[in-house]
Amino acid sequence: MKKSIYPFLLLTLLLLVSCKSKKRMVATLPRLVLNTDSIVADTSNVIAGLFAPDHSQLKDLNVSKGRKRRAKKNKSSADAYKSEDWVLRGTKITSSEVDVSSVYSGVDRVVKYDFTHRDVPEAFEGFRIAFISDLHYKSLLKEKGLNDLVRLLIAQKADVLLMGGDYQEGCEYVDPLFSALARVKTPMGTYGVMGNNDYERCHDEIIRTMKHYGMHPLEHEVDTLRKDGQQIIIAGVRNPFDLGQNGKSPTLALSPRDFVIMLVHTPDYVEDVSVVNTDLALAGHTHGGQVRVFGIAPVLNSNYGTRFLTGLAYNSAKIPLIVTNGIGTSQLPIRIGAPAEVIMITLHRLKE
C-alpha cells in the first residue's frame, strides 16, 4: 500500500470517529470494519451510502453509456443482462448475504449464491461449495479469528471447500493455519490454488503442508468430483501473473459438456486469456478494495479498475466470475467498506 494513501486513511478514520452509529462501528486498530447493515436507523442515507458494498449485482456495471441507453428501452440494464445470460448460457444467479460479525470475530458476513446452470448434473442438485481466499494469516486474521472461521465453515455444512490463495504472512504460520483448516471436513475434500504471496514465499512448504493434511493443491491441474455416476470438474490455475508459463488455461482440454469450476487467485486471468469450457470462475486477490470510502478504493489490485473488484462479474465471453473480498488484509490491518466474507454457492440444475 503506497504512502500516498496514508492521508486518505487518516481522513477516513476521522470520519468514522465522527459518525453517530452506535452498533459495531469500530474506529480503532487492529480491526476496523464497517458494514452497511450495522448502521443504526437514525443515520442519514448519505452516510449509509458511503460504505454500501456493491457485491451482489447481477452484471458488470462497467458498461458504456450507449449500452445503458439501449438497455433502458425495455428494462433496466441489469435485467437486460440477466435475461440475455439466461438465453445464451442457460444460467441464472441470485445472491443474498447474512451478517455474522456479532457471532464470529474473523468474518463479517456470509455471501450466498444460488447458481443455476443447464450443465449442472442432476446428482449435484443442491451441492454446496464454500469458498474462501486471502486469509493473510496473521494480518487482520489472528488465532481467535481463525478458530471462528473454522467454526463458521463447519456450520455451513459444505460439500467441498475451495481456497483462492494468499494464505499467510510468514512461513511460520503455514502449519498452524492448515492444521486449523483441516478441522473442516467435507464429503469432497478441500482444494486450493496459490496466490502471489504464496509464490513469493513458502510455496513449497504450503504445498507439502496441504498434502500432509489431506488437502489438494491445484497448479494448472484439474480434479473430478464424482457423485452417483456423474461428475463436475475443478480446474486450478498456477501463478496467473506469469502468462508466459501459464497463459494456456487448464480448461482448454476439457469437454464443453462437463460443468467446470475454475479456481484462480486473480480475477484478471479470466479476461487476460481464453478460459473456454469454464462455467463458473472463483477468484480473490482484490480484497474488495480493502478500503472503500465514498465508493472509491484508493488501491485496486486489478488491471481492469473496478470491473472485477468484488462480487459477481462477467468476462468478455460472458463467463460468470465471483470475486470474494477475502478475509485478511495486506500492508495495514484495516478494512473499511469491504467486509471480510465467506462465499457459499449452491448449485442447481436448470430445468428446461
Residue ranges of each PLM-predicted region?
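Positively charged n-region of N-terminal signal peptides that target proteins for export
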Residues: 1-5
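Bacterial N-terminal signal peptides
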Residues: 8-15
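Acidic, histidine-bearing metal-coordination/catalytic regions of metal-dependent phosphoesterases
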Residues: 19-128
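Extended active-site neighborhood of metal-dependent phosphoesterases/phosphodiesterases
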Residues: 90-92, 97-102, 114-116, 179-243, ...
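Membrane-embedded segments
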Residues: 106-108, 120-208, 213-216
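Beta-strand-turn-beta hairpins that frame and shape the catalytic cleft
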Residues: 108, 117-130, 215-216, 223-236, ...
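Active-site neighborhood of phospho(di)ester-bond hydrolases with catalytic His/Asp-centered motifs
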Residues: 132-133, 160-166, 189-196, 218-221, ...
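Conserved beta-sheet core of the metallophosphoesterase superfamily
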Residues: 182, 267-346, 350-352
